A protein has these predicted regions:
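Catalytic cores of DNA base-excision repair glycosylases
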Residues: 13-28, 33-199
């Protein structure tokens, strides 16, 4: 039992409200309210409205360490210049970095190009749909692989970042170090066990 400030959790809902005691005896108690909260308040984002594997991959890389509002114009401009994996694989680095200019963390752009080259040579230009295959691409870690697999390919894969780890640690009164890779792997496994297959 822990006290969650600012959250009201019920059978079918999760709202921001007054502090209430929350009993999290098992993670499956929070899945349904979280999904209902998402359905009610989700943001309309271009990469979610047309969630092709390329669009989701590009957006997830751009969103690393960058605010959503800052990414939107770059995302649109990038897709106009490089609309698919092949054009990304073939672009000159100078043009790529010019398109990326202002987003920072330029290795993200370089890894996108490297990964696009690998997708073209090893997968015929089709971004692989399996989580394990996505992890083999440069610049794609477990969070990004989970996001691509779940959003673009409808797979039951969590996308666990620091926010998810912190929230679950608080809900479960778990004092393990969330920076420990073993803790993240454990949380990913726990979440796979409660994720609904119809979402």
């Amino acid at each position: 039992r822990i006290l969650a400030y600012g959250c009201l959790v019920g059978e079918d809902y999760l709202t921001i409200d007054e502090p209430v005691p929350v009993f999290v005896d098992s993670l499956d108690r929070i899945a349904k309210p979280l999904l209902a909260w998402y359905d009610a308040g989700r943001r309309i984002l271009p990469w979610r409205e047309e969630p092709t594997p390329f669009h989701v991959w590009l957006s997830e890389i751009m969103l690393q360490q960058t605010r959503v509002e800052a990414v939107k114009p770059y995302y649109d401009r990038f897709l106009q210049a490089l609309p698919d994996v092949r054009s990304l694989a073939e672009v000159e680095e100078e043009k790529l970095l010019k398109l990326w200019e202002g987003l920072g963390y330029y290795n993200r752009a370089r890894n996108l190009k490297k990964a696009a080259g690998k997708v073209v040579t090893e997968y015929g230009g089709d971004i692989p749909g399996r989580y394990e295959e996505l992890l083999k691409l440069p610049g794609i870690g477990s969070y990004t692989a989970g996001a691509i697999a779940s959003i673009a390919f409808d797979q039951v894969q969590p996308a666990v970042d620091g926010n998810v780890l912190r929230i679950l640690a608080r809900l479960r009164a778990d004092d393990r170090d969330i920076l420990d890779a073993k803790v993240k792997k454990s949380v990913e496994e726990d979440l796979r066990g409660i994720m609904p297959i119809d979402r």
